[in-house]
Amino acid sequence: MQYRPFGTTDFQVSALGFGAMRLPLRGPGASDIDEPQTVRMIRTAIDAGVNYVDTAFGYHGGQSEVVVGQALRDGYRHRIKLATKLPTWQVKAVDDFDTMLARQLGRLQTEHIDFYLLHNLNATYWPRMKDLGILERAERALR
């Protein structure tokens, strides 16, 4: 696996990451993820050197985070950097940040998220994020 510097951090990110937006399904429903196959896929990628896994609150109706959390059990979590995303369109009040973050930590079965991204941040949602102080809230969550 090839690795590259991740911005100005000390982290060397694998040239390939694992994105969990479209996972194998058992049936027609978007949240009906084939969990055993997905866990095998994620762990195979990590065993091959992938060290960046990306998911989001809304992927597969929220089930992507759950299955990613399952895949990262048994020692896999410490081998990767985990990214997920705050659904900016669902943030209506300042406390929504804490509620969403806690829910995502629970789904992912982890105590921390390495990269917490603002999902679908655009001209519509940016003013609300700014007015609610979401960036400051995120900085406080780092501590």
Task: Place the predicted regions along the sequence by residue.
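Generic anion/oxyanion-binding catalytic loop in active/binding sites
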Residues: G27, F57, L86, A102-L105
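Active-site mouth loops of central-metabolism enzymes
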Residues: R22-P36, K85-D95, T124-M129
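Proline-rich low-complexity regions
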Residues: S14, P87-T88, R107
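Glycine/proline-rich, positively charged
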Residues: V91-R143
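Conserved beta-strand positions
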Residues: F18, T55, T84, F115-L118
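Structural motif corresponding to the early beta-alpha repeats
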Residues: Y59, G75-V94, H119-N122
